[in-house]
């Protein structure tokens, strides 16, 4: 009944107008699973490899026909006839077939598309929602959203060096209330920016991209918008940052071009600690560069007991890199991006390792997204308690929020909103 009879790959467009891979997996009973693969802008050096064609005459070299060919050829040949329920075996077969440590031969974008589509097809065969199929009967926790309302860095054409300024409505009573709160703050912020003479165009993830001179200026706007929307910063709504520090770490220094200054690793750690002291910041992602391990140890020592320190480029959803952080005591949280590692099995293993070590896990989108809402289901399936999926604009972002609304409604009285308990600062 759940044997794989067909795998169909195709080239589609992501939210930035770049090609990406979409995969359909068809089972013997007629069930179909479809998955589209996201793509990052600020990518970690240690991520699994996204295979691009490199043909400059087509999509400026960003085509993914080689990855699609791998899906329709080698991967189907290897997986045809296998039971879609055998997720671990299927993922392991693809990893071994690729034969490289970073999935560079067949492409993580090809392998991930198949991996997620297989799980969705199997869930469909059992007439189960994906979160229930993957997470079982214990999957009922709706995550606190990290809503990116001001964009900078690689996600916007403005002077701000930090990549994301986010709000977390952790004080809400339910996911739907948290979403409403975020929406109200988003629209209030738009009015405040417009009133101050800033443009209100949005960046890749739907947040505003004003020409502000510093992180402090952006944070002041965020705190003001929270208050003017009728909420209390630090009580109803918290702030999260993603500096994406690897992007401006040059020759051992954190170079703030817009502010005309450079900081060493110890100075960077102290600067972030100062921001946490002055603003209701409860989470910082990639506050230090991916290979600045001494910097990571410094910031963990300074504020690791009161602030969530999330490793994105640092850990790249990889259990080997995560284990090193756990063993050596740096960071206290991991960002989970399915395309950083390339299979569902490895993604779930990273969440499990984090939770066992007392680290938090944050399910995350990429800046190049599609209408695919798989990560919403995975956030609930893993009970990770937090999701990062952009702003309250652009359908590629709201598709995930809308799926979580559906899940919350479907769970009814069983639904549990993670709230403040999901955050290090309130434990």
Swiss-Prot record:
Disulfide bonds: none annotated. GO terms for molecular function: magnesium ion binding; phosphopyruvate hydratase activity. Pathway: Carbohydrate degradation; glycolysis; pyruvate from D-glyceraldehyde 3-phosphate: step 4/5. The active site is at 205 (proton donor), 337 (proton acceptor). (2R)-2-phosphoglycerate binds at residues 163, 337, 366-367, 388. GO terms for biological process: glycolytic process. Catalyzes the reversible conversion of 2-phosphoglycerate (2-PG) into phosphoenolpyruvate (PEP). It is essential for the degradation of carbohydrates via glycolysis. Belongs to the enolase family. This is Enolase.
